[in-house]
Amino acid sequence: MTESVLDYMTRLGRAAREASRVIGRASTAQKNRALQATAAALDEARAELSAANALDLANGQANGLEPAMLERLALTPARIDGMIVGLRQVAALADPVGAIRDMSYRPSGIQVGKMRVPLGVVGIIYESRPNVTIDAASLCLKSGNATILRGGSEAIHSNRAIAACIERGLAEAGLPAAVVQVVETTDRAAVGALISMPEYVDVIVPRGGKGLIERVSRDARVPVIKHLDGICHVYVSAHADLPKAQKIAFNAKTYRYGICGAMETLLVDQTIAADFLPSMAAQFREKGVELRGCERTRELIDVIPATEDDWHTEYLDAILSIRVVSGLDEAIEHINHYGSHHSDAIVSDHQSQVRRFMAEVDSSSVMVNAPTCFADGFEYGLGAEIGISTDKLHARGPVGLEGLTCEKYIVIGDGQLRGQA
């Protein structure tokens, strides 16, 4: 009798829960051995990885995948190199598990503090990019978590080949294969099952398009670490160094159009707009960026009229909305109303203005005189990241190793009894 998708996912979940107890108590040295051995296995399996990826690319072309999707799907030699380097970098990171802080004596004589521990089992749902399999597996492993990885059906052969390398690495370190499990079925019902197993899965991390993340957020029966959009702003204030502001705004938009930290709306103070916008617009046009602007912007430069929808849109493309604002108050109001609480920046040399912006903009990252594209775990010194969270509970901003752990209280006594002196 063929195993149903629900039975299959339940089997994975049960195995992951058992494996989480093993990896949760594994030493840092053992976890690092698994990471280094996986890196070596990837290096030895380059031909197998390339062959599996060629199957996915051929199927993708036959199924009419867009060129951008095919590009993300490709496992080039450079990307294989990147996966190997990434594993070694995670191995070199400090292990957060077991760290104890804030120990203090209470009047009763007991000591109270906090210990950092793994979350348990992390389910990760992602699309297209097979290198995410390694990113996610390495972070979960190092942070002492078991993980169930459900990649996109378009990358199934690549993910299976990568999973074989991970299994070799785990075996060499004496860890069970169920520490990292890749979902083998392409049936979409697997996603529904994975997000509905609170008895086996402690948290879900969706990485992909807005539709996927909305579905997971709506239907999940376990906590979700996620962000929906990256509608990021740069506000150029009246107190900005304009040449510096132009460089920051240009980098924020053009570093990479498709990342969630790319600037989508440029806010410019009305007092400097006439001096700033013409040359700024010329730089964007030379780069091929389509500009859309409010009425006041259009009085200064020739741009497409911006609609209400533009302020709500994450373009992930060479398109930029521009709005002239009356000052700091309107800039903050615009960001908090239209933004996605991801990453927003101010360019200003006025310290009290900067402090207000940092305090009042309700985003997971706030930049001062720096572009929003710095919103990245590596740039923040976290090493790799599992994703970026715009929620306020548990992790917020780029989620690295520490974000895949939590704290529990530890209480140490010497026979003290409550209510007795």
Swiss-Prot record:
One GO cellular component assignment for this chain's record is: cytoplasm
Source organism's superkingdom? Bacteria
Checking InterPro entries in the record gives: Ald_DH/histidinol_DH, Ald_DH_C, Ald_DH_N, Aldehyde_DH_dom, G-glutamylP_reductase_CS, Glu-5-SA_DH, GPR_dom
- Catalytic reaction equation(s): L-glutamate 5-semialdehyde + phosphate + NADP(+) = L-glutamyl 5-phosphate + NADPH + H(+)
| A Pfam family assignment | Aldedh
Q: Biological process GO terms, please?
A: L-proline biosynthetic process
- State the family it belongs to: Belongs to the gamma-glutamyl phosphate reductase family.
The entry's protein name is Gamma-glutamyl phosphate reductase
Q: Could you tell me which species this protein originates from?
A: Pseudomonas syringae pv. syringae (strain B728a)
Gene encoding the protein: proA
